[in-house]
C-alpha cells in the first residue's frame, strides 16, 4: 500500500481544514464526564490536602502526580500502560529456583584425545 492510497490523495494536494459547525461542549457535558471518574468533591479534598502537606502522600495513597504508591494511576493502569490483571505486583513475585548440574567426570580422556588430534592436524598443515 502506498502513501497516496493510505492518505487518500496525491502528494501535491493539500486538504483544507474546515471549522467545526458545533460549539465546544458546555459545562453540562463536563459534569457528565466527571461522573465516570472521581467526583469533584474528592478531587477538591485531594488538592486541599496536597496544599496543606506538600511532598507527602495523602491518606488515600496518591502522590502529587496522581499516581498511587504502587505505581498504578487512578484508572487502574500502571505507568507502562498495562492493566493490573495478569501481572505480578511488587512484593508478590514467585521465587525462581535454579538447579546446577554436578560436574560430570570421565570426559577428560575424550577431550584430551580431540585436543591432541587438533594439534597434529595443525602441525601437519603447517609442514605440508
Swiss-Prot record:
InterPro entries registered for this protein in UniProt: CYSTM1-like, CYSTM_dom
Keyword flag Amino-acid biosynthesis: no
Keyword Lipoprotein: yes
GO cellular component, as recorded: cellular bud membrane; mating projection membrane; plasma membrane
Principal localisation: membrane
Modified residues (N-acetylserine): 2
Keyword entries, A-Z: Acetylation, Cell membrane, Isopeptide bond, Lipoprotein, Membrane, Ubl conjugation
Residues in cross-link Glycyl lysine isopeptide (Lys-Gly) (interchain with G-Cter in ubiquitin): 32
PTM comment, free text: Palmitoylated near the C-terminus.
Membrane-topology descriptor: Lipid-anchor
UniProt biased composition (Low complexity): 37-106
Region of interest called Disordered, as start-end residue ranges on this chain: 1-106
Record family assignment: Belongs to the CYSTM1 family.
Other remarks on this protein: Present with 1760 molecules/cell in log phase SD medium.
Name by which UniProt lists this protein: Lipid-anchored plasma membrane protein CPP1
Protein's organism: Saccharomyces cerevisiae (strain ATCC 204508 / S288c) (Baker's yeast)
Amino acid at each position: 500500500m502506498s502513501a497516496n492510497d493510505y492518505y487518500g490523495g496525491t502528494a501535491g494536494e493539500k486538504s483544507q481544514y474546515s471549522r467545526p459547525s458545533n460549539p465546544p461542549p458546555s459545562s453540562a457535558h463536563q459534569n457528565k464526564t466527571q461522573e465516570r471518574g472521581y467526583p469533584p468533591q474528592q478531587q477538591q479534598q485531594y488538592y486541599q490536602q496536597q496544599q496543606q502537606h506538600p511532598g507527602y502522600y495523602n491518606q488515600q495513597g496518591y502522590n502529587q502526580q496522581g499516581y498511587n504508591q504502587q505505581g498504578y494511576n487512578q484508572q487502574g493502569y500502571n505507568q507502562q500502560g498495562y492493566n493490573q490483571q495478569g501481572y505480578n505486583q511488587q512484593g508478590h513475585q514467585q521465587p525462581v529456583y535454579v538447579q546446577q548440574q554436578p560436574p560430570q567426570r570421565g570426559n577428560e580422556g575424550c577431550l584430551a584425545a580431540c585436543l591432541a588430534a587438533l594439534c597434529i592436524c595443525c602441525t601437519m598443515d603447517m609442514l605440508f
